[in-house]
Amino acid sequence: MATAEAQVNVNRNLQKQDLRNLEVSNLTPLSPEVISRQATINIGTIGHVAHGKSTVVKAISGVQTVRFKNELERNITIKLERLSEKKIKLLLKSKHQRHKYDIQQQKLLRILAERRKARAMTPLAPASVLAPSMETARPRLRSTSLNSLSPSNSSGYGSILGCDDSDQSSQLVLKPNVLKRRRSNCVQIPTPAAKRSRKNDGTTVKRRPKGEYIVEKIESVEVVQFQPVFFVKWLGYDVSANTWESYVNLSDCAEMEKFVERHLQLHQHYIAQITGELDTQLSDIPQTEDLKTISIAEIDAYDPLELQIDFILLAQYRAAASRSQREPERIGARALHRMQVRRSHFARRKQLIDLLLFEHRMNRVELPSPPIRVENNWDLDTIDSGFKYIQKNIIGEGVPKPQAGLVGCMCRHQSGEQCTASSMCCGRMAGEIFAYDRTTGRLRLRPGSAIYECNSRCSCDESCTNRVVQNGRKHPLVLFKTSNGSGWGVRTPQPLKKGVFVCEYIGEIITCEEANERGKAYDDNGRTYLFDLDYNTSRDSEYTVDAANFGNISHFINHSCDPNLAVFPCWIEHLNTALPHLVFFTIRPIKAGEELSFDYIRADNEEVPYENLSTAARVQCRCGAANCRKVLF
């Protein structure tokens, strides 16, 4: 078999080439090196031919067969096919495109150099200017990184994360200064996609806020101080500008969901083991104990991605057979806690749905009064499903039905004006004074006084000053769960002045005999909703309002030894002294957000006992007032 040296001696036209000095990018099909139809091959290790420029020469040249001996004097033959005209054109085209790409890269480098020079000449703005504040709102995407961030490599994740840039990741870890500089550049250099542009109609597209960048891909996740950090590739930036970002900077990013889903599938075997172990531990913790270590705010802020990321981190430790114990233990405890939060989160969602349904039913009944909002930011309780919200009293068995008005005032006919304190209005006709201030419409009576409003027999219309209770509630309220153990309460979302009508005490009107029987059961539960209609203290009350199962917003108003509401008896259509309306008015100015309360023990007449209460048990007062009596009844 002839050698390559023999062929050179036979063919005098062949030229000996030194491929180490050959500039491949300048070769064309007409180059002398190609026309010579010669290829000199650098020999590497046994059975291998060194790659590089020589390979390009062989591909462009038309050498059909090359024979040579390797270092062990073994003959090696390489056969090459002649390139077609089509392939030659494609090679020339690719060379032109490469040249065009090099020009674009040089232009981009010049632009970046000019920007760096311009930034060096101008002072840096504070961090609050470069990026939006975290307290106000969590931005969708931010490039702000953790300070001095360098992921832990104790678990050996580099081989199992599926990161395309593992070498770059390791370089960034070994050179924290370079990493910090990269992040600084990433924050300060605006992304090309952030530039202002114009639509076809000429309108300007709003520019993205400074400090926000688009995530192209999340490459991997590591652990820094027991918290996950993510290696992020930014859109419009080279991989050298990748940064490590905390979860808070990426929580609203769509790429985060893709990353988590991808890694859940990758580690599904280990995650199944981990979740099984944690479920066993969770089953040993009663759900009633959850709220002792978990707040409602934490439940509302529950993010399922955070729990899934903990599963991924634990799975990576197992997949890498890491010897580290401290980090997996801490992350495992955090995952168990988040599983508790998840369990309470499901109960919280059901609770919010139930409260919303009750709120809708209540406000439909209350129309056209202002809406009442329902909220519970303390525990997972809901409104008792046995409670029925009503707008008017239910007349029980043995209670006479009130009749329509038999007499009314003639103020409008006599003076031609509305009812006033000086006119012979309903109040004066009943032996009381006019109840409301004509200018403000607020109550001007002292607690314990009776209110007589105009009725259907009066000559005045609905705009009369003496028609307040019958026109309904005019102020919005909030039904909320208290934090002092008093159950549900009512507060006002806006300030209320003294003498403002709040609501009427609504429920079932029953006889006192029936009330005594019900009162025994209510006392055992430490709650009572019985309200005696005993304005006429000269004799025992005949009837009682029971708001335990049927009632309105007044059902939830709590007791206070220093109340801001008082109960007034009010007559409108009928004058049966045994069946007054029980109405609440403010007795002092009330601030927005303050809880509404009244004295259950009739502070206006301490000598009158609460007849329907047994003495078998004492209920502790939780009002917290300075003059608190400590015992409710």
From Swiss-Prot:
The keyword NAD does not apply. InterPro entries: Chromo-like_dom_sf, Chromo/chromo_shadow_dom, Chromo_domain, Chromodomain_CS, H3-K9_MeTrfase_SUV39H1/2-like, H3K9_Histone-Lys_N-MTase, P-loop_NTPase, Post-SET_dom. S-adenosyl-L-methionine binds at residues 486-488, 529, 558-559. Residues 407-472 form the Pre-SET domain. Zn(2+) 1 binds at residues 409, 411, 419, 425-426. Zn(2+) 4 binds at residues 561, 621, 623, 628. GO terms for molecular function: histone H3K9 trimethyltransferase activity; histone methyltransferase activity; zinc ion binding. Its main location: nucleus. It is found in: Nucleus; Chromosome, Centromere. It is an enzyme of class 2 (transferase). Transmembrane segments: none annotated. GO terms for biological process: chromatin organization; methylation; pericentric heterochromatin formation; subtelomeric heterochromatin formation. Keywords: Centromere, Chromatin regulator, Chromosome, Metal-binding, Methyltransferase, Nucleus, Repressor, S-adenosyl-L-methionine, Transcription, Transcription regulation, Transferase, Zinc. Zn(2+) 2 binds at residues 409, 426, 454, 458. Residues 617-633 form the Post-SET domain. The keyword S-adenosyl-L-methionine applies. Pfam families: Chromo, Pre-SET, SET. It catalyses: L-lysyl(9)-[histone H3] + 3 S-adenosyl-L-methionine = N(6),N(6),N(6)-trimethyl-L-lysyl(9)-[histone H3] + 3 S-adenosyl-L-homocysteine + 3 H(+). Residues 213-271 form the Chromo domain. Belongs to the class V-like SAM-binding methyltransferase superfamily. Histone-lysine methyltransferase family. Suvar3-9 subfamily. Histone methyltransferase that specifically trimethylates 'Lys-9' of histone H3 using monomethylated H3 'Lys-9' as substrate. H3 'Lys-9' trimethylation represents a specific tag for epigenetic transcriptional repression by recruiting Su(var)205/HP1 to methylated histones. Mainly functions in heterochromatin regions, thereby playing a central role in the establishment of constitutive heterochromatin at pericentric regions. Involved in heterochromatic gene silencing including the modification of position-effect-variegation. PANTHER family: HISTONE-LYSINE N-METHYLTRANSFERASE SUV39H, HISTONE-LYSINE N-METHYLTRANSFERASE-RELATED. Interacts with Su(var)205 and Su(var)3-7. Probably associates with HDAC1/Rpd3. This is Histone-lysine N-methyltransferase Su(var)3-9. It comes from Drosophila pseudoobscura pseudoobscura.
